[in-house]
Amino acid sequence: MLRSGRTVHGAVAVVSLAALMLSSACTKGADDGSSNSGDSAQQQVQATSGAASCTPEKYNGGVPKLDLKTITVGFAQSEKEANPFRITETQSIKDEAAKRGIKLITTNAQSDLNKEIADIQGMIAQGAKALIISPLNSEGLDPALKAAQDAKVPVMTIDRLLTTKTACKDYLGWIGSDFVVQGQRAADAMIKATGDTGNVAILLGASGVNVTVDRTKGFKDQLVAKASKLKIVAEQTGDFTREKGQKVTEQLISANPGITAIYAENDEMALGAVAALKGFNKKPGDVKIITIDGTKGAVQGILDGWIAGVIESNPRFGPLAFQALEDFYSGKGVAEKTIISDKEYTKENAASELANAY
């Protein structure tokens, strides 16, 4: 998800060609079960923050060097696999483990923080010697992280950042998108789609996660930076779900009939908004919708005229996550943050890029 203007705080290391060329075996598409195995569909590294210095000797006072092919790796999924992002994320981890011949056990917390803690503790008890975790919240996993530390089990985090924890101490490292920049790019797309005029409603993501905070900040700050004439007239959480996205949009349109644009902080809420607009007898394009994710449903929404633009957030973490574990155990080292690059779907490229959506 490479775009000019993206900044990374901290030292930026040069990413090796090998890392840039990583691709996984077939990754299942979320909507139709098809596979997206082309390099253009896979995550690409844009930059790393901090030196690639976390090694077994430095992590948590020192942990054993192990061969990934001889151990069990655990993957903790935070949310039920009911939306394309989570379906594709889990499948990518499974596909890459199979490709590398690594024994994998998986859990799903069903959007319950206490269950995710118990899941992680349970995988450690089952003998997992390394973990990949997709955190439900940016905070609150302390008991699970403590269990991993005590057992000398390294933890690689993906997607949501543990904002109060320290890399190479509480967890190994993090791989994910620059969510602030996603919000900035969404603002740019909104300005273009609306001609920089109108009333905007924001469908906020779930509370307590850095994704929501950063996507909101990026969007609002960019409107200010561009001296935009757009006016934010309402914002309410849709919890990243289609059902709540529809319900909240219905409430917002009823209270603010002058809304002419919607910024949805993920595609599921955007598709819920589309359903709500249809209920108000709106026509495609009457209300401009900009969203973030890159699901097939949202990209198809561009082709159908209901969605004006989509900023990608790529969930295919498998190749980079397992490569990070390989680099860790080999002594090559892992960076504090690995930022991936995101595409943008527009009416100009939606048809040709639909196959790369998930």
Model-inferred region functions:
Residues 2-20, 25-358:
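A residue-level marker of the well-folded mature domains of exported/periplasmic proteins
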